[in-house]
């Protein structure tokens, strides 16, 4: 199979097709206007990375054209030898260029792939008609990041977090009490902790946040870290294709330059569903400027494409004198966020049903612990690969029961 991709800045329009047919393509031809030269170079690097990850051998050719020059377009056709195994991947491209190449390829018995990012489906068009297909090979977060020529520098290990659920449920049952316990730990009011908050303190000891003497074992404000884990444990019950926690991404230089984002960004929770990326920001307390948090999320989200979405989760302290009478994300801020595909969960306590409703409406997911099952299977496989004897195998089975 020969895949001819028209390269342009909106990568989400064509990387799903590249991934869908990665195992069938033996040759990529990247066609691009001279103004998109850098994007073509980045995509070539990204496909080479993908080939390395999946041990693929596809060749890559690049073809620069001036889409405003008719003679240049006609000359370009001489470098494309169309067969019945040639497919054009041109969603989102310049219309004139797409029509020109589509006509040429169809006339020579090739095919055109028309990808619909909203439905994550595509049509295979021939000169005799078309057939509709759904994308079958869904990208993981790693795949998506690879095809954007970015790098995940680090991420948290989610598997151990699954064992923290009971402790976190107890801590977030009453957020006001959690804030008060935090204040007492900072003051080292041992008697008050022993008398009124011993069960919550025990949960923090189990999570290795404090020691048995109620001294901090972690640096900084641990409330945000706890919220991140707690939200993660609520998210994994839904049918996302992949989830990452505390992931730091190093973005490619083109995205840094064009989207005005930082070279590196840390995401509390990253998710992907049907090849569309999203993220969740977890914040405890009040920020200096809530609208700035919305604008920051929007600027980062632009990188993930127009169908990316995010949620900001903010749990406030009901005893904070600055915001006792109102929440910091007022209706005007929520409306502005909604226009940018950002949902807001802002309250004094955590209502699981309300959060799940927001999660479903934002990311179009349903409750099904697909990712949790995959995580357990991967953990078991990793364990199984380490052991060979019958005794060791039985130990693996025991481990699986404990997950």
Where are these regions (language model features)?
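N-terminal beta-strand-loop-alpha-helix module at the start
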Residues: 1-49
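Structural motif
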Residues: 5-10, 32-35, 90-92, 284, ...
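Short beta->alpha junction loops
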Residues: 6-9, 59-73, 283-286, 347-350
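Short, aromatic/basic amphipathic alpha-helical patches
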Residues: 17-21, 39-53, 101-103, 322-340
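A charged nuclease-like catalytic/ligand-binding cleft shared by nucleic-acid processing domains
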Residues: 28-83
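Short, acidic/small-residue loops that bind anionic groups at enzyme active sites
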Residues: 86-90, 105-126
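Short Gly/Thr/Asp-enriched flexible loops that form oxyanion-binding sites at enzyme active sites
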Residues: 93, 97-109, 333
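Intrinsically disordered, low-complexity Ser/Thr/Pro/Gly-rich regulatory segments
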Residues: 140-403
């Amino acid at each position: 199979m020969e895949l001819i991709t028209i390269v342009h800045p909106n990568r989400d329009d064509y990387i799903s097709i590249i991934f869908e047919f990665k195992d069938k393509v033996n040759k990529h031809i990247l066609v691009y206007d001279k103004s998109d030269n850098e994007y073509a170079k980045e995509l070539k690097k990204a496909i080479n990375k993908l080939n390395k990850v999946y041990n693929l051998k596809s060749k890559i050719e690049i073809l620069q054209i001036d889409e405003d020059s008719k003679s240049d377009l006609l000359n370009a056709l001489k470098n494309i030898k169309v067969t019945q195994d040639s497919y054009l991947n041109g969603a989102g491209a310049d219309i004139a260029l797409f029509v020109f190449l589509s006509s040429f390829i169809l006339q020579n018995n090739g095919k055109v792939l028309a990808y619909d990012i909203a439905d994550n489906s595509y049509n295979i068009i021939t000169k005799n008609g078309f057939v509709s297909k759904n994308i079958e090979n869904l990208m993981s977060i790693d795949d998506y990041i690879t095809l954007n020529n970015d790098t995940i520098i680090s991420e948290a290990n989610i598997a151990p977090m699954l064992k923290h659920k009971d402790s976190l449920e107890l801590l977030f049952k009453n957020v006001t009490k959690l804030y008060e316990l935090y204040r007492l730990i900072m003051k080292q009011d041992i008697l008050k902790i022993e008398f009124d908050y011993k069960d919550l303190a025990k949960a923090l000891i189990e999570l290795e946040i404090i020691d048995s003497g109620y001294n901090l074992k972690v640096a900084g404000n641990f409330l945000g870290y706890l919220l991140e884990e707690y939200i993660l444990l609520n998210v994994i019950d839904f049918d996302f294709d992949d989830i990452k926690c505390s992931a730091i991404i190093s973005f490619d230089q083109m995205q840094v330059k064009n989207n005005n984002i930082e070279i590196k960004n840390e995401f509390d929770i990253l998710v992907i569903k049907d090849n569309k990326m999203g993220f969740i920001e977890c914040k405890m307390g009040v920020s200096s400027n809530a609208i700035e948090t919305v604008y920051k999320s929007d600027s980062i989200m632009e990188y993930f494409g127009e169908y990316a979405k995010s949620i900001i989760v903010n749990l406030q302290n009901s005893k904070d004198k600055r915001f006792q009478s109102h929440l910091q994300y007022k209706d005007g801020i929520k409306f502005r966020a909604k226009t940018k595909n950002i949902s807001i969960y802002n309250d004094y306590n955590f209502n699981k049903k309300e959060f799940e409703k927001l999660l479903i409406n934002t990311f179009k997911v349903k409750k099904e612990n697909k990712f949790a099952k995959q995580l357990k299977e991967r953990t078991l496989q990793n364990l199984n690969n380490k052991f060979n004897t019958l005794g060791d195998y039985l130990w693996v089975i025991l481990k699986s029961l404990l997950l």
